[in-house]
Amino acid sequence: MTERISLTRYLVEQQRVHGRIPPQLRLLVEVVARACKRISFAVNKGDLGDVMGTAGTENVQGEVQKKLDIIANEVLIEANEWGGHLAAMASEEMDGIYVVPNRFPQGEHLLMFDPLDGSSNIDVNVSIGTIFSVLHKHHDDPTTDEPVTEADFLQPGHQQVAAGYCIYGPQTTLVLTVGDGVAMFTLDREQGSFVLTRENIRIPEDTKEFAINMSNMRHWDAPVRRYIDECLQGKEGPRGKDFNMRWIASMVADVHRILMRGGIFMYPWDKREPNKPGKLRLMYEANPMGWLVEQAGGAATNGRQRILDIQPAQLHERVSVILGSKNEVDRVTSYHSGI
C-alpha cells in the first residue's frame, strides 16, 4: 500500500530536509489549510446551510458580495489572527489591511487572499476556490519594529514565500508552492486531513487548449485578437493544429485544469475601460497563480511584462493576465512586442 503523506508531514520534511519552511510559515500554511476545510464544508452545504445568495453589500471593487464571500473572509481572518504567525492580512473583500490586534502576538508574515474566487458560480454549483499569497513583513528591513502599513504589502510577486489555492469541486484540493515546485493535496473527509496526491506538477510547454471569454472579443487589443484568430483557424491556419476552448469563469478552476493538463488562460486588457490595466487583482489572484504556474514550468505575463516583476502601486491593483503553457504565453507576449 502506498504511504500516505499528510500536509503536516510534507511541511515538516520540507523544513527539516530542505530548510525552506521556517516554523512560523509552516504554521501559517497549516492554519490556512484548516480554514479552507471549514470553507469547504460551508460550500458543500449549499442551500442546506443558508449560505447561498447575495449578502446585499458590495466589496471595494463595487462587486455584489455573496453570503459565502463574507463567510469565507471571516473564517480566514478568525483562523489566522491569534496564532502568532502573522502581522497583518489583506483581502479582496476588504478596503484596507487587517492588522493583527494587540491582544495577540504578531508574527513575521503577511497574508493576502481572495477568500472565494469565482463566487458568481456559487449558485450554479460550479467549482470555486480560495487563493492565498504569503510575504515577509518589512521585506526591505526585517529588523525594524515599525508597525505594519499598507505599504509593506506592496511587494512584487517574486518576493512571495508561499502561495496556493484550495479548489472546492468534486474533491477539495489544496495546491501549494513554497518555491520548490508545486504539490497537490486532496482532502480526505473521513480522516479530516489533506493528503499529498501529486508532487512536482509540470505544465506541458505546448497545448491545444485556450481559456478566454470569447464574448469580449470585439473589445480586445490587436495582439490578443491575432492569437485567438490563429487558434480558431485550426489545422488550415498558421498554427497547423486544432484548438479547443475552455472557459469556466472561475480563475481557480481554469488554472487548476491548466496545471493538470496544460493550456493557456487569458484575461486581457480591453477597450471598455482603457484606463484600467486589466480586470484581475495583482496581489490576490495574479501573483499567487503566476508563481504557481512558473513553479510548474509555465509562464505568466501581462502581455508585456512578467507578472511577478510588476511593482504594485496599490493594494487592489488590477492587471491583465496571460498564463499557462510556456510556449503559448511566449507567443502572445511576442505579439504584444511586435516580434
Swiss-Prot record:
Protein name (record): Fructose-1,6-bisphosphatase class 1
Gene name of this polypeptide: fbp
Annotated compartments: Cytoplasm
Complex formation: Homotetramer.
Entry-linked CDD domains: FBPase
Similarity annotation: Belongs to the FBPase class 1 family.
Residues annotated to bind Mg(2+) 2: D114, D117, E285
Catalytic activity: beta-D-fructose 1,6-bisphosphate + H2O = beta-D-fructose 6-phosphate + phosphate
Cofactor binding note from Swiss-Prot or TrEMBL: Binds 2 magnesium ions per subunit.
Cofactor: Mg(2+)
PANTHER family from the UniProt entry: FRUCTOSE-1,6-BISPHOSPHATASE-RELATED, SEDOHEPTULOSE-1,7-BISPHOSPHATASE, CHLOROPLASTIC
Domain of life: Bacteria
Cystine pairs: none
Binding site for substrate: D117, G118, S119, S120, N213, K279
Keywords, alphabetical: Carbohydrate metabolism, Cytoplasm, Hydrolase, Magnesium, Metal-binding
Classification via Pfam families: FBPase, FBPase_C
Organism whose genome encodes this protein: Acidovorax sp. (strain JS42)
Pathway: Carbohydrate biosynthesis; gluconeogenesis
Residues annotated for Mg(2+) 1 binding in this entry: E92, D114, L116
Enzyme Commission number(s) from the entry: 3.1.3.11
Gene Ontology cellular component list: cytosol
Gene Ontology biological process: fructose 1,6-bisphosphate metabolic process; fructose 6-phosphate metabolic process; fructose metabolic process; gluconeogenesis; sucrose biosynthetic process
GO terms of molecular function: fructose 1,6-bisphosphate 1-phosphatase activity; magnesium ion binding
Transmembrane regions listed in the UniProt entry: none
